[in-house]
Amino acid sequence: MASNPNFNEKTSALDVAHHYASQARNKTVLITGVSRYGIGEGIARAFAHGGASTVIVTGRDDTRLSLVVKDLTTDYPSVKFHPHKLDLTSLEATRRSANEVLEDDTVPKIDFVVANAGGAFLGPRQLTPDGLESTFAINHLGHFLFVASLLPKLRLAAKTSAPGDTRVIVISSTALHISPFRFADYNFDGNVVPEDEAPNWAPIKEIFGFEEHEGYSAWIAYGQSKTANVLFAVHWNTLFSHEGIFAFALHPGGVKTRATDEVSDMMAKEQKAKLPDPFEKTIDQGAATALVAALDRELTPEKGVFLNDCQVTDVPPYADSKDKAQKLWKLSENLVAEKLGSALQLA
């Protein structure tokens, strides 16, 4: 449980930031996937509201970044907002982007990283320039490389902060219930998937009407990527919690954004009615759980790494298994080394 049991699905991120202002004040935050009218903007706005001194906002489009920075600066003129280009579809571009952050002397340390970018990419299977299934590449592997590369600046923050005050927050989803991580066929190349990695077809059939089938499914791809987000947090804590850098994953809720409007528009009325978490939260409400995960000192990895509606909650055993988390971390390291020709250095 979070330290405030009254926080719930209706809680405002601005209220959370005000409640934990002592934790946000004068801190440096980096948030991926920030654009106008999205959850990332809501998270950035809340950190600024709580008194953060520097907020780095990343995205693929320079024009969109400049627009959101203009909006945020107008409302919070005392906060330094840094736009930073990040394209998670390319591992080389991701590495280059991370190195630019590391080389930026105006940002000596980073207290919080919020891995918010990504989404569900409906339609047929798509591959990135690295030959990876796009949902896995963007939602997990790109963030794995980017966040892990920022470890030196997270460590600098941790050295001058109380243990656990430096954190990595990963935006996951309750869609993790759709599928475990498919180690046997994470890229949807057609390999046989063992029973313990098979998807849960029941909610897919109930909501979307899809019968069980072989081959690619955008929803299964999304589900396994959200499971990967939690496993990333689990193994991050194994590696770095002793250094005072914690990681948590969370479900922001069904948030009404432009992106979810596009998904909603593709669904029939009957399908929308069956959604366990319809797109009814405001952006401010959707950002609230990320603020709790970042700022509540009562949270520790031992109490749980996944939050929903501002409270710690359980996930299926396959999503917080330390063995599976370690296995995914190793797979991710190997893929980065294979695609980039050099290993990720974390020592």
Residue ranges and their predicted role:
Residues 68, 228, 232, 286-290, ...:
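Alpha-helical packing segments of well-folded alpha/beta enzyme cores
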Residues 57, 86, 278, 317-320:
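Pocket-edge positions in alpha/beta enzyme catalytic cores
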Residues 130, 134, 216, 220, ...:
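Short coil/turn segments at secondary-structure junctions
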Residues 299-347:
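C-terminal tail/cap regions
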Residues 7-256, 261, 346:
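Rossmann-fold NAD(P)H-dependent dehydrogenase/reductase core
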Residues 1-11, 256, 260-282:
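Alpha-helical membrane-targeting segments
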Residues 225, 273-312, 322-324:
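C-terminal helical subdomain
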Residues 154, 294-298, 336:
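Short, hydrophobic alpha-helical segments
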